[in-house]
């Protein structure tokens, strides 16, 4: 933003002779106090083909500039005819009124200037040598061309006041800011969810009593569920105790069976031993009988007799 704004320029002596000075009434506004002066300058364009013929007619320093609207008259000397090509003395040219601050131009106003002879006879039959005394100028003040430029004013070095960039710290700050934003969003979402759960009356008032009743019911329901859970847990504990008692009873009943089984095994072994003894006695008797048979059987000699 420009601190100085050009509000208007008024050309005072127009038309005028070529040799008359230029006079401008300039009005501008200053928004902030300035440390330096404003430099106003008027330039005459001597030739459209080259910048070598441009002439700086005059310059003026205005200051100190107070804050607010300011007005002054800028007077500049006419151009030197000797520095202008003869073929362009009587023609259309341009003058430039510019303003700079601290060597930096921020506004420029251009005007077309028509230079011609003051008599119809000279206009129809121009002399071979230009007669400067008979040349008049007419500035087209109604059609100025204004150009503005952005410059740095007195706050040019404000950037040095700020601390230097610290990449690591800056990244941490950004991360913290992002976390804070996320937390805020989550809190907003939770708040919205809570608002949706609350019932609103027709008039837009919240039915707090119903909410309390609901809360009590919910609490009672939770306590009832807790009681049911406690009963179930107690039943399960009773069942576990019964299962343990049944297991102990089965163990006790199984013990006599084990004893009976051992006794049966001993009886069976005793019977088996008795059977084996009986078998062995039978075998002994058979062997004895077999040994006695030769004594009773007749001999071959007896059979022949």
Curated annotation (Swiss-Prot):
The gene is ASF1. Residues 168-213, 221-249 have a biased composition (Acidic residues). One of its GO terms (molecular function) is acetyltransferase activator activity. It is found in: Nucleus. Keywords: Chaperone, Chromatin regulator, Coiled coil, Nucleus, Transcription, Transcription regulation. This is Histone chaperone ASF1. PANTHER family: ANTI-SILENCING PROTEIN 1 (PTHR12040), HISTONE CHAPERONE ASF1 (PTHR12040:SF0). InterPro entries: ASF1-like (IPR006818), ASF1-like_sf (IPR036747), Hist_deposition_Asf1 (IPR017282). Residues 259-272, 278-295 have a biased composition (Basic and acidic residues). Belongs to the ASF1 family. Histone chaperone that facilitates histone deposition and histone exchange and removal during nucleosome assembly and disassembly.
